[in-house]
Amino acid sequence: MKRRRGAGNPISTGLKKILGGRGALVHDAGVLTPDPAVIKDSLCAVSRQLGFSGCRVARAEKSPHAEKLFQWLERGWHAGMEWMARSPERRTDPAEVLLGCRSVICLSYDYDSPAMRPEGEGSICLYAHGKDYHGILEEKLADLQELLSIYGGKQKGYVDSGPVMERDHAEACGLGWRGKSG
């Protein structure tokens, strides 16, 4: 799938709609800096245009479940998932992944739709229908990262594949919760 550029790009379209009449810069000790409220509004509006159903921002804090992860690894419960044991500190603290990180943007994307449900008797998990969601969402994240770069931000985007404990951040900002699997 080709990335959209120019006038049809949700980034440029979204920014024109959102910023019309509002200043994107505020004075901070005599220096013009991006207004966090405008950045958040822009981000959430563009994320909706890209098909995300939820957009929330959490503080980039160390995971409250860090100790549980360390114990889980110590006990060898990660079985053949050796990557889990590499740099566990990075999994529990966003600042270890991106120096100076202050916020974690959490997004949700609904993949349950009648069009995705196959006819017939058998059933499989809805996320397994259609194309692999990783590639689809990674492209959408690239568009959002482009928006944040316009404001001078440094960021990293992951689709359940990075070292961050995304459940903790999603729960902290009200976009998710911890189920029985912890």
PLM segments and residue spans:
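Auxiliary alpha/beta "docking" domains used to position bulky ligands
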Residues: 2, 15-182
